[in-house]
Amino acid sequence: MIKQRTLKNIIRATGVGLHSGEKVYLTLKPAPVNTGIVFCRADLDPVVQIPARAENVGDTTLSTTLVNGDVKVDTVEHLLSAMAGLGIDNAYVELSASEVPIMDGSAGPFVFLIQSAGLEEQDAPKKFIRILREVTVEEGGKRATFVPFEGFKVSFEIDFDHPVFRDRTQSASVDFSSTSFVKEVSRARTFGFMSDIEYLRKHNLALGGSVENAIVVDKDGVLNEDGLRYEDEFVKHKILDAIGDLYLLGNSLIGEFRGFKSGHALNNRLLRALIEQTDAWEVVTFEDASTAPISYMRPVAAV
């Protein structure tokens, strides 16, 4: 049986919020079966919990924000991408502020944290959402689609009219039966244009952004001294973002996601459209792991 997974141990980290610039304390904790991923604002009394579900998404302007009433948690997508990539079904994410720390702008540090905490299988079957037919949403020349696929695949195309992007791959398709999320996707960093960052800072956004946690592009090229981690790091980061956004379904996917210039808003619209169209998907479990179209790394012991 493919079983649900949680963390073996509690683990903590400190970072800054990308948009707030605030110092944030992050604690990842194990959770019981069928809990899902739950964000907890530990700085509030009483603590406010926000389950990582598509219906709890509020603002999607620059990141994916979860809301519960007037309480929010910003920038959840990179941590959720790491949770999805490592097959974590159940965990509590405690935060001391309203934003998940940006770390280095990728999911890599979160992968390291989760692997350091160790993974533990739980005595309950892991639930997958299997796509049964195509579902598409479009808006302003952007498109996001689910199609049936025996496995998990993410295809993405970006289209930036800028020399840095024109000279590099702007499309990628990753089939996770043959490609490692950890090696090929998790280290892709978020990116931004110098001109946009100056505008955002005037509006009290991207206050924590720097070349330490983002790829910064100006009219001449990439400003980061070390350059890119992957030749196709820009589109790979869009795939990373999409994996995090898709995990707001609450379960791992069996199917393919195709994005064309899609962002957090359209990704969430696609999830909501899928949820409403109940004939387009089903929940499945696997008694025999060898028959499943998706496999996960064996649980690792805590470091």
Curated annotation (Swiss-Prot):
Family under the similarity heading: Belongs to the LpxC family.
Keyword field? Hydrolase, Lipid A biosynthesis, Lipid biosynthesis, Lipid metabolism, Metal-binding, Zinc
Q: Which domain of life is it from?
A: Bacteria
Listed binding positions for Zn(2+) are H78, H237, D241
Q: Does the keyword Metal-binding apply?
A: yes
What residue ranges carry the coiled-coil annotation?
none
Q: A Pfam family matched by this chain, by name?
A: LpxC
* Cellular component GO terms held in the UniProt record: membrane
In its UniProt entry, the species of origin is given as Pseudomonas syringae pv. tomato (strain ATCC BAA-871 / DC3000)
Question: Which reactions fall under this protein's catalytic activity?
Answer: a UDP-3-O-[(3R)-3-hydroxyacyl]-N-acetyl-alpha-D-glucosamine + H2O = a UDP-3-O-[(3R)-3-hydroxyacyl]-alpha-D-glucosamine + acetate
Query: Its biological function?
Result: Catalyzes the hydrolysis of UDP-3-O-myristoyl-N-acetylglucosamine to form UDP-3-O-myristoylglucosamine and acetate, the committed step in lipid A biosynthesis.
Enzyme class, one word?
hydrolase
A GO molecular-function term, please?
UDP-3-O-acyl-N-acetylglucosamine deacetylase activity
Q: What is this protein called in UniProt?
A: UDP-3-O-acyl-N-acetylglucosamine deacetylase
Please give the cofactor(s) recorded in the UniProt entry for this protein.
Zn(2+)
Task: Give TM regions.
Answer: none
